[in-house]
Design a protein with these regions (language model features):
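NAD(P)-dependent Rossmann-like dehydrogenase/reductase catalytic/cofactor-binding core
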Residues: 1-85, 91-175
Length: 175
């Protein structure tokens, strides 16, 4: 789903009701500081069949209907889920990418072998490093940072190598 009309540089837009519509950056919708509907990430917006959204606490039901209508008009099946950090796809892929970067860093396998093992062993469409690279290392890092800050749990702590790659604008798949 691409937000076009009134889209901000940060991947946000405003619904006709004035509610913020934002792509998931790891923070729950309620943490955005205003009524908001957050849209989960996908592997490929152009081919996705469905997408999850979550509304902030106190968000008007009409805003959820507006967001749902917009996404359905784009051909997506919409699933309304609880407002939680990282939603579903964003949290899962960020954690998989982080684990893969950590395995690469610790010499478990090469980047290519990690992606191949996950594609063939789990039937994922992409390996976790390729998927994380598609979203961008800085995005994966910001999602994990937001989740760790919200939960205070080290399981969301980004790998030191992920931090280094994101800071350098590098590629998760390069050894």
């Amino acid at each position: 789903m691409e937000i076009r009309a009134g889209e901000g540089r940060d991947g946000t837009a405003e619904l006709p009701s004035g509610t913020l519509l934002a792509r998931c950056d790891g923070r729950p919708a309620t943490a955005l500081g205003r009524p908001a509907v957050v849209v989960d990430r996908t592997l490929d917006d152009a081919t996705a069949a469905g997408i999850a959204i979550a509304a902030s606490d106190g968000c008007a039901a009409g805003a959820v209907d507006e967001a749902t209508g917009l996404l359905q008009a784009a051909g997506l099946t919409v699933y309304v889920i609880d407002d939680a950090p990282g939603l579903v796809v964003t949290r899962t892929v960020a954690m998989l990418a982080n684990g893969a970067v950590d395995a690469r860093h610790k010499g478990v396998a090469s980047a290519a072998d990690i992606d191949t093992a996950m594609r063939l062993g789990t039937n994922y469409p992409l390996g976790p490093l390729a998927w994380g690279q598609r979203w961008g290392p800085a995005t994966v890092l910001s999602v994990l940072d937001a989740m760790q800050a919200w939960y205070g749990d080290d399981r969301y702590r980004p790998s030191a190598l992920l931090r280094r790659i994101a800071a350098a604008g590098g590629d998760l798949r390069e050894n």
